[in-house]
Each structure stands twice: as C-alpha cells, then as structure tokens.
Amino acid sequence: MPIGVPKVPFRSPGEEDASWVDIYNRLYRERLLFLGQEVNSEISNQLIGLMVYLSIEDDKKDLYLFINSPGGWVIPGIAIYDTMQFVQPDVQTVCMGLAASMGSFVLAGGKITKRLAFPHARVMIHQPASSFYEAQTGEFILEAEELLKLRETITRVYVQRTGKPLWLVSEDMERDVFMSAAEAQAYGIVDLVAVE
C-alpha cells in the first residue's frame, strides 16, 4: 500500500508551532533540489522555477542539486543547464547513483570546483538521439539537422566544462561511455569524489 510523500515537521522562524510539510518542500527550504527521474518538461520546469525562486529569495546562498537520473529529453535538460548558469547563487551538483545522458550534462553544469560524485556513482555521456525515425523524409532531414546542432552545442559545453579537447569529447560521444566517479573526476565532469 503506497503511503505517498512523507511529511516532516517544519517550524518557520518566529512561529511557535511546527507545521507538517512534505519532505521535498522541507528540503527545498534548505535549498536542496533533486533530479531523481528522467529529464522531461515537467521536472525541468519545476527545477527551473525552484532555482529562480530560491535565487530571488537569497542570491548569495548556494543551491544543491542532487542527481540520480537516466537522462531524458535534450531541450528540457539544456533549459536546466542554462538556468544553472543564469541564477546568481552557485549551483553545486552531486551525483548519487547514476547521471547518464542529460543527467551527466546537468551534473557537468554545476559550479566548477563544486561538482561532486558519491564514490559508487556512475556517469555516462553519449550523443543525443532522435525518436522521429518514422517521420517523412523531409521531416527526417530537418530533424537530423536540428539534432546535429544540438549535438554540437552539447559537445562544446562538455569541452568548456571539462577542459578536454573537442576531438576527444566528440569521439567519446559517438557511443555510450560509462565512467566511475573517479573516472568522471579525471574526465572533468566532476571535481570531487566523496570519501567512503
């Protein structure tokens, strides 16, 4: 029997009694955000809204984005990345479990020197894929052109964020490249690996 989202007590400053809020709202109040699912428009908009709101509330205090994601849609992932670069506070990224595809792109988008992976985390990079393989020829060509532009954008961001040469990142994105936390650190996707 599902119990829903757990609730925890929270007392606002100046209030005598605590109120019960769902655990995610409590964590958001501490500036802790979660990408724990496939990247899509809904989770992207939710994270963007939270980052913007929290940066307006306090533009000096860091945000923490915990990532355990198999990847997902490219455009919503790029929107999360762009928002991370736009907001005033630093966004620290933490990989726990898996950051694959768009998940690794968002992970790399954290403030350089503030990107962390748990010791047993896995990171995977690859090129963006299309689901329009049943489209008419004309549509398919347009889709392929757009996909090439997106691939170039993603590759250039990885080059900028990791310090790796363009040829290496481009070659690695040709296939699924899985990395341990230490390998992701050596590659430049994360800066630190948490100690066990």
Curated annotation (Swiss-Prot):
State whether it acts alone or in a complex, and with which partners, per the record. Component of the chloroplastic Clp protease core complex.
Query: What EC numbers are recorded for this enzyme?
Result: 3.4.21.92
Q: Which Pfam families match?
A: CLP_protease (PF00574)
Q: Does the keyword Repeat feature in the UniProt annotation?
A: no
Q: Record's family? A: Belongs to the peptidase S14 family.
Concerning CDD domains, the annotation shows: S14_ClpP_2 (cd07017)
Name listed for the protein in its UniProt record: ATP-dependent Clp protease proteolytic subunit
**What's this protein's function?**
Cleaves peptides in various proteins in a process that requires ATP hydrolysis. Has a chymotrypsin-like activity. Plays a major role in the degradation of misfolded proteins.
Source organism: Lotus japonicus (Lotus corniculatus var. japonicus)
User: What's the catalysed reaction?
Assistant: Hydrolysis of proteins to small peptides in the presence of ATP and magnesium. alpha-casein is the usual test substrate. In the absence of ATP, only oligopeptides shorter than five residues are hydrolyzed (such as succinyl-Leu-Tyr-|-NHMec, and Leu-Tyr-Leu-|-Tyr-Trp, in which cleavage of the -Tyr-|-Leu- and -Tyr-|-Trp bonds also occurs)
Q: Which PANTHER family does the record match to this protein? A: ATP-DEPENDENT CLP PROTEASE PROTEOLYTIC SUBUNIT, CHLOROPLASTIC ATP-DEPENDENT CLP PROTEASE PROTEOLYTIC SUBUNIT 1
In its keyword annotation, does this UniProt entry include Protease?
yes
Keywords for this entry?
Answer: Chloroplast, Hydrolase, Plastid, Protease, Serine protease
Q: PROSITE patterns this protein is in? A: CLP_PROTEASE_HIS, CLP_PROTEASE_SER
Q: Which gene encodes it?
A: clpP
Give the main localization category.
plastid
Any Gene Ontology CC annotation: chloroplast stroma
Gene3D superfamilies per record: 2-enoyl-CoA Hydratase, Chain A, domain 1 (3.90.226.10)
Active site, renumbered: S101 (nucleophile), H126
The organism sits in which domain of life?
Eukaryota
Any one Gene Ontology molecular-function term assigned to this protein's record: ATP-dependent peptidase activity
Q: Where in the cell is it found?
A: Plastid, Chloroplast stroma
